[in-house]
Design a protein with these regions (language model features):
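N-terminal strand-loop-strand beta-hairpin
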Residues: 1-113, 157-174
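Short beta-strand elements
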Residues: 34, 119-123
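Residues forming anionic-ligand binding surfaces in small-molecule and nucleic-acid pockets
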Residues: 63, 123-129
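A short, polar/proline- and glycine-enriched secondary-structure boundary/capping micro-motif
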Residues: 70-74, 129, 140-141
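Short glycine-rich, acidic/polar surface loops and turns
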Residues: 113-119
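A generic structural motif
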Residues: 132-138
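Mixed-charge, glycine-accented linear interaction segment located at domain edges/termini
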Residues: 138-162
Length: 174
């Protein structure tokens, strides 16, 4: 419904926790993500760009507490990092330790105001995320309304969605 296929990636997320600040208790997250760009559209093989090169990007993200009970809306602060291994070593030197990794193959579909991601999460299966980035809290209600309308077009409702993160789902399986 107005969406076009963008990039296809493999994302490896390593979340961190701390003995002095348990992010499970505070409903926050600290994550390092390594993203392999597998290509775009239908011009890709299973895991390679057409010339065999795989572009890899890394970023660190802090996620604040969820802002409501019906969505995954929260403050997210992200920054690209040059050296993934050095950043991981810095976090560990500061007392953070890695927890269960989340690995997924993600297809990005872009709409006018919304991005839909189809995720194949290792150990969990397939999920869809609908996301609208807002730069002002006053726009959040409108964004949730647009997501609800898109779900209805797909024969779904907000009741069919989950606010449980992939990390939490994987940890519950252990």
């Amino acid at each position: 419904d107005g969406f076009h296929l963008g990039t296809i990636t493999r994302e490896t997320d390593v979340y961190f926790n701390s003995k002095t600040r348990d992010f499970r208790e505070t409903d926050e997250a600290l994550r390092l993500r390594r993203t392999e760009n597998l290509g775009s559209g239908y011009l890709i093989a299973d895991n390679e760009l057409s010339d065999g090169e795989v572009e890899v990007l890394s970023e660190i993200t802090y996620k604040g507490r969820k802002l409501d009970d019906i969505s995954m809306s929260r403050l997210e602060l992200s920054s690209r990092i040059v050296d993934y291994d050095d950043m991981k070593a810095i976090l560990e030197a500061l007392g953070y330790y890695p927890v269960t990794p989340v690995v997924k193959r993600r297809k990005y579909y872009h709409g006018e105001e919304m991005v839909a991601c189809i995720d194949d999460v290792e150990g969990l299966g397939n999920y869809m995320e609908l996301e609208i980035i807002v730069d002002d809290e006053s726009k959040r209600e409108k964004a949730l309304g647009l997501i609800e309308k898109q779900l209805e077009r797909l024969g779904l409702s907000m009741e069919d969605t989950t606010t449980i993160s992939y990390l939490s789902m994987l940890e519950r399986k252990e």
